[in-house]
Amino acid sequence: MNLDFIKSKIAAVPDFPKPGIMFRDITPLLADPQGLRKTAEAMAQELKNKGIQPTIVAGTESRGFIFGVALAEVLGLGFVPVRKPGKLPRATYSVKYDLEYGSDSLEIHQDAFKVTDEVLVVDDLLATGGTAKATVDLIEKTQAKVAGLIFVMELDGLGGREVLAGYNVSALIKF
């Protein structure tokens, strides 16, 4: 896999967005002509190693769109966007979830998946797991099955894996 390459393209930005936070910036990875493809290929290899065989990919707005579409292309699968409220034109399911300060919501079209679908959730970062769990809850409202979740990076020690206990969770890089 290309994990050393991927990790080398993620910039550490201290004290952003506030003092004491080490922000992991993916823009250098995306700016590299090989960055997105190598990341998607590494994700595909991780899925193969774990025996995860999704039938469709879902990505959470907004960076999950970037990596989700790239991975769907590598896997030869379709892609479904999980959106912020009010962005989808047809009937939707909605899930509200808590953030550090306040709450947010995510939506998905009610007909986004077939009951037989094995959905892979893709996003750039697993931290507390709130957004990922909301995405899982939306998928389960459609009666589809969650095949697994995969992230470019995981911030260890923030409880994301615990929130997603019972699901197959992978991250290419841990910080």
From Swiss-Prot:
UniProt GO molecular function: adenine binding; adenine phosphoribosyltransferase activity; AMP binding
Chief location: cytoplasm
Reaction(s) catalysed by this chain's protein: AMP + diphosphate = 5-phospho-alpha-D-ribose 1-diphosphate + adenine
Localization: Cytoplasm
Keyword set, alphabetical order: Cytoplasm, Glycosyltransferase, Purine salvage, Transferase
EC code(s) of this entry: 2.4.2.7
GO terms (BP aspect): adenine salvage; AMP salvage; purine ribonucleoside salvage
Stored PROSITE patterns: PUR_PYR_PR_TRANSFER
GO cellular component: a single term: cytoplasm
SUPFAM superfamilies linked to this entry: PRTase-like
Annotated pathway: Purine metabolism; AMP biosynthesis via salvage pathway; AMP from adenine: step 1/1
Protein biosynthesis as UniProt keyword: no
UniProt xrefs under PANTHER family: ADENINE PHOSPHORIBOSYLTRANSFERASE
Assembly and oligomerization: Homodimer.
Functional description taken from the UniProt entry: Catalyzes a salvage reaction resulting in the formation of AMP, that is energically less costly than de novo synthesis.
Protein family: Belongs to the purine/pyrimidine phosphoribosyltransferase family.
UniProt protein name: Adenine phosphoribosyltransferase
Origin species: Francisella tularensis subsp. tularensis (strain SCHU S4 / Schu 4)
